[in-house]
């Protein structure tokens, strides 16, 4: 018997998360690890759960995620974006709630490139007057 699945792709910085929602008890599995195992910081765990908490669907879906690229913070943001998109596919009535909270918007902020003549993107080498 095929179970109902909802997919959503989330992106943030260099991270890409492929999220799969299935009706269940609220388990969150990221790259075959539990949420607590994958994200050691409570703030990152909360970031991942935000769309589910806001829509009160935390105990209605099991979330399976494959995430790659970026660091932990970017990955958490990508997962949040992916979960929000999958929730909208599951129930279109949740769209205004998630949109108002800003979870459906792809955060466009990226790392600024380094320019020649500078140490980093904007940091100049030390200036010597004499």
UniProtKB/Swiss-Prot annotation:
NCBIfam families from the UniProt entry: PRK00132.1
Protein family according to the UniProt entry: Belongs to the universal ribosomal protein uS9 family.
Keyword set, alphabetical order: Ribonucleoprotein, Ribosomal protein
Composition bias, Basic residues: 111-130
Keyword Ribosomal protein: yes
Protein name as catalogued: Small ribosomal subunit protein uS9
UniProt keyword Lipid metabolism, yes or no: no
Database matches in PROSITE patterns: RIBOSOMAL_S9
HAMAP family associated with the record: Ribosomal_uS9_B
Single Gene Ontology MF annotation: structural constituent of ribosome
Lineage, broadest ranks: Bacteria, Bacillati, Bacillota, Clostridia, Thermoanaerobacterales
């Amino acid at each position: 018997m095929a179970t109902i699945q909802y997919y959503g792709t989330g992106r943030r910085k260099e991270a890409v998360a492929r999220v799969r929602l299935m009706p269940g008890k609220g388990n969150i599995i990221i790259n075959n690890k539990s949420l607590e195992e994958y994200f050691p910081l409570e703030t990152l765990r909360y970031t991942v759960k935000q769309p589910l908490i806001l829509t009160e669907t935390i105990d209605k879906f099991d979330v399976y995620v494959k995430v790659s690229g970026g660091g932990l913070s970017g990955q958490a943001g990508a997962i949040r974006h992916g979960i929000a998109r999958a929730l909208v596919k599951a129930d279109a009535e949740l769209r205004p709630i998630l949109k108002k909270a800003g979870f459906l918007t792809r955060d466009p902020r990226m790392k600024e490139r380094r320019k020649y003549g500078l140490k980093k993107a904007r940091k100049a080498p030390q200036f010597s007057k004499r």
